[in-house]
Structure formats: C-alpha cells, structure tokens
C-alpha cells in the first residue's frame, strides 16, 4: 500500500470518496493521481497509465483539453459560482437544444450529478401521475438514491432506508420484454415510470436486444407511465443525438451527465415543457441545488459539446474503436479463449465468459478470478481499465495511435498470460 493511499484511508472511508475507486473488485492498491493530460494520468509514484476509464466516461476529449482549460480559466475570472441564473446557463442550454435537435416545446433543468438528475426524473414521474411504483432493470445503475439500489453489489450497503424504498421499486431482468409486458399488464396502472439505460454500462457493456427499448417505451405510452431514458453514459458519446437518436425513439424524459460537464460536475433533465413545468417554481414538484448550473461547469460543458460537433468527430471515435479493439477480438476468436469482448461506440467490456451476456445474470457467470488476473497484468503494464468486471471502459478522442498500439499489445499479452498461451 502506498504512503498516500494509507493517508487517504485515515481520512476517507475505504480511502476513497466513491467506492469503486478503491479497486477492491480487481484486488489492487488504487493509484493516487498526481496529474493528467490527454489520454494518460501520472500517479503519485510517477508511473504513467494509459487511461481507459476517463473519469468514468466523462472525458470524451481526454484529460485537460486545452480549449476546455482555457475557457475555464477565462470564466473563473468572472466568478466561480453565483447562486443566480447566469448567461452561461442560457448559452449552454441553447447549445444543447441545437446539438440534440430538441423541439421548442422542450425544457431543461441543470443539476450537478447524475444521481440528482435521475432522482428528479423519478420525482416528476411520481408527482405527475400520482402513482407509487418505479420499474428499473437489474444491473442498471442510476445513482445512489435508495429507489435504485436494490440488487448486489448495492443492496447490502444500504440498510434500513433501502428496505423502506423496496416496495416502491421493481427490478426486472434487462432484455426480457415478455416478462416486462406481463408485469405492466398487471401493475401498469400503479407504475409512475420506467427508468432504463439504453446501453447498459454498469454490469459491463450489455446491448439491448432488437425492439426491447422500443417495446418498453411503447408499453409506457399504453399504460400512462413515464419512460425515463438514462443517457448519463451514452449521451454525447454514442452519437450526436445520443442513444435516443440511434434507436429512433422518443422517451418522455431524458437524463444526461458526465460528458455534459466537460470534466466538471453537471447533469440535466430534459423533457417536453408540459412535464418540466411541473418543477418548482412553475409547478409544485420541488427540486433545487446550490451549485445547479454552476457557471464554470456550463462553460466547460459548452466547449465539450462544441468539440463533439466538429466535423467527423464520431467517425474518428469509431475508427479509434475499430483499430484498437478488432485485433483483440481476432486474438480471442482465433485462440478460442473463453472471453467475450463487447463494444458499442467508444464503450467496451471484457467478459470472461464465452457467451455474450444479455442481462445481469449472464454477466455474473463471468470468471471473476480470471478477470482479476487479466486486470492486474494490464495494470502492471501501465494500462488502466475501469477497475471492475462490471464496469464499462471508455475510449476518447485523445487516445493516440502510439498509446493504443501499446495498450493493444499489453491487453493481448495479458490475455495470453491468464490462459497460459505463452
């Protein structure tokens, strides 16, 4: 254990301020970051890592992008927080509406975290419908509100408050539309909303089967329940209009975060104004936040979204993904090792299971011990993946060919080492 991490453990529970950072799922001492630039971070021991976590998907442009940094420095001279509506909020809202192609009957409410945004979306659904039940899907993560933390690894850490929330939340298997439809046929009149990730990123990367997302949204329309698409991970990452655009769907409520803030804390709820105008002060559903719409986060977010709009940005990301991951897939296929590499856009996961998972139960069949050995080997070579077998890793536009070539070789060598192919 490093000296700094020992000191961190004196001050923070588990030495961290968010649990997965402790790296216990991969059985390593977590690195303590000293600085970061582009696709790498350097730890307190002066070791360089190629970063495929990127602040859990927030840094699609890499660390310390010069345009984002310059805008923040300039904005800081005008003030770090106002507690009032600012010009920066309005300009950023205009940018988002243009980028997402939102109609004029939509509105947005800025917040600071994804958890705040999902909690607000659920509060809207319950407040407007007067119904108590929220449906989510097993393995999908929507923040740390008790409403969302039903299944492992979260349930055993949430004690009595979670038990009180359980009767109001139903968790169903992802991708099982017949079961979902059966439940909605029985309980739909009590369901305020259904919240879902369009592409799962917190049980590893798991894709929806054909027509699942469309079916969920259509069923919500039929029962008068709100469909809530959590695009905290996929928004601004998988396409200009997010996953909603890729799947050609129109959920009732959209939730954004991560990339939205350009590396600073920002999130948002977006919906038609007949929904959003139920929020205070226009309506009676309360939501507030001291740092909501923080001017520096708005500035960083606006630059981040502008960079995503540059010609060929998503084509560039797709090329990076293809060049980096295809040779690894080829190695897995030709050697016959029991590993599945799942990728979607610039998200990817290694499942130590020969079969592609469709839900949490499938993902949990993975060989966790083998994943840990793989992770530890890659980490020792300076490749930092998201430190859990059930978390997505991320590519960014900042990943250079040199870094990708090195990481590709390191990951292949690590797979060979785990399965004694060398």
Swiss-Prot record:
Quaternary structure, from the entry: Homodimer.
Organism: Chlamydia trachomatis serovar L2 (strain ATCC VR-902B / DSM 19102 / 434/Bu)
Modified residues (N6-(pyridoxal phosphate)lysine): 258
EC number: 5.4.3.8
Cofactor names: pyridoxal 5'-phosphate
Record has ATP-binding as a keyword: no
Protein name from the UniProt record: Glutamate-1-semialdehyde 2,1-aminomutase
Pathway: Porphyrin-containing compound metabolism; protoporphyrin-IX biosynthesis; 5-aminolevulinate from L-glutamyl-tRNA(Glu): step 2/2
Lineage: superkingdom: Bacteria
Subcellular location: Cytoplasm
Signal peptide: none
GO cellular component: cytoplasm
Family, similarity comment: Belongs to the class-III pyridoxal-phosphate-dependent aminotransferase family. HemL subfamily.
Keywords for the protein's UniProt record, in alphabetical order: Cytoplasm, Isomerase, Porphyrin biosynthesis, Pyridoxal phosphate
């Amino acid at each position: 254990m490093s000296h700094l991490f020992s000191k961190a453990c004196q001050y923070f529970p588990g030495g961290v301020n968010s649990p997965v950072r402790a790296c216990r799922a991969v059985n390593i001492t977590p690195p303590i970051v000293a600085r970061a630039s582009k696709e790498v971070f350097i730890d307190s021991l002066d070791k360089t890592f190629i970063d495929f976590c990127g602040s859990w998907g927030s840094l699609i442009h890499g660390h310390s992008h010069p345009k984002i940094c310059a805008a923040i420095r300039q904005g800081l001279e005008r003030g770090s927080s106002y507690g009032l509506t600012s010009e920066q909020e309005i300009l950023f809202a205009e940018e988002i509406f243009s980028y997402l192609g939102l109609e004029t009957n939509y509105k947005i409410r800025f917040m600071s975290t994804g958890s705040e945004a999902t909690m607000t979306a659920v509060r809207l659904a319950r407040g407007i419908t007067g119904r108590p039940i929220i449906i989510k899907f097993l393995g999908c993560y929507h923040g740390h509100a008790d409403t969302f933390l039903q299944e492992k690894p979260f349930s055993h850490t949430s004690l009595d408050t979670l038990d009180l929330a359980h009767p109001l939340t139903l968790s169903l298997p992802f991708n099982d539309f017949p079961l979902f439809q059966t439940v909605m046929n029985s309980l739909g009149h009590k369901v305020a909303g259904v919240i879902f990730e369009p592409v799962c990123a917190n049980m590893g990367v798991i894709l929806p089967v054909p027509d699942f997302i469309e079916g969920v949204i259509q069923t919500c329309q039929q029962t008068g329940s709100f469909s809530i698409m959590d695009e905290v991970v996929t928004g601004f990452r998988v396409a200009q209009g997010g996953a909603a655009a890729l799947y050609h769907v129109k959920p009732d409520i959209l939730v954004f975060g991560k990339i939205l803030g350009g590396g600073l804390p920002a999130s948002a709820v977006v919906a038609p104004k007949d929904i959003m105008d139920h929020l205070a002060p226009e309506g009676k559903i309360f939501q507030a936040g001291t740092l909501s719409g923080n001017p520096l986060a708005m500035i960083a977010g606006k630059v981040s979204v502008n960079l995503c709009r540059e010609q060929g940005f998503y084509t560039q990301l797709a090329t990076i993904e293809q060049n980096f991951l295809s040779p690894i897939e080829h190695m897995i296929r030709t050697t016959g090792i029991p590993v599945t590499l799942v990728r979607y856009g610039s998200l990817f996961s290694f499942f130590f299971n020969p079969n592609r998972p469709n839900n949490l139960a499938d993902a949990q069949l993975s060989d966790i011990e083998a994943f840990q050995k793989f992770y530890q080997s890659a980490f020792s070579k300076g490749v930092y993946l998201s430190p859990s077998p059930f978390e997505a890793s991320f590519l960014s536009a900042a990943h250079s060919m040199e870094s990708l070539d090195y990481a590709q070789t390191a990951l292949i060598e690590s797979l060979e080492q785990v399965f004694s192919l060398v």
